[in-house]
């Protein structure tokens, strides 16, 4: 336990929390050719690779993912939610934060129904999460 004099001299430091989606915290200034701190809720990117991945130990599946080069020039791995998708290389996608617990290294989700990503066909419930139209 610090003495009062030590607290007067140094003070207490508050803990800094690390971002769970660091790629969304920076944008790219092409004039200065540097990344600028500018947090955003979503970000646009181009899919450089689309494939499947197997989840961690107790689960078994082929989870769909895309490697995306964002507009701030960072490359991230993003999960494609829902059943079936129309994504391929060079598709323009919208990325949001949110990890997939059983896929290591996947910290982002692709927003369905935005830009080149189509919504899920025949979806009746939770339609807004999958970009599905009514009817």
UniProtKB/Swiss-Prot annotation:
Acyltransferase in keyword set: no
CDD domains (alphabetical): Ribosomal_S12
Origin superkingdom: Bacteria
InterPro entries to which the protein is assigned, alphabetical: NA-bd_OB-fold, Ribosomal_uS12, Ribosomal_uS12_bac
Annotated spans, Disordered: 1-24
GO BP annotations, alphabetical order: translation
Keyword tags: Methylation, Ribonucleoprotein, Ribosomal protein, RNA-binding, rRNA-binding, tRNA-binding
Self-association and partners: Part of the 30S ribosomal subunit. Contacts proteins S8 and S17. May interact with IF1 in the 30S initiation complex.
PANTHER family, alphabetized: 30S RIBOSOMAL PROTEIN S12 FAMILY MEMBER
Protein name: Small ribosomal subunit protein uS12
Lineage: Bacteria, Bacillati, Bacillota, Bacilli, Lactobacillales
């Amino acid at each position: 336990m610090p003495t009062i004099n030590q607290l007067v001299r140094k003070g207490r430091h508050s803990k800094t929390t690390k971002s769970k989606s660091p790629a969304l915290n920076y944008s790219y200034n092409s004039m200065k050719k540097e990344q600028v701190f500018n947090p955003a809720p979503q970000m646009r990117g181009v899919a450089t690779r689309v494939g499947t991945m197997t989840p961690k130990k107790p689960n078994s599946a082929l989870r769909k993912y895309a490697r995306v080069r964002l507009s701030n020039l960072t490359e991230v791995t993003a999960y494609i939610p829902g059943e079936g998708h129309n994504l391929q290389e060079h598709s323009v996608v919208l990325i949001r934060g949110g990890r997939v617990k059983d896929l290591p290294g996947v910290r982002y989700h692709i927003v369905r129904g935005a830009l080149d990503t189509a919504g899920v066909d025949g979806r009746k419930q939770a339609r807004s999460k999958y970009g599905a139209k009514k009817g």
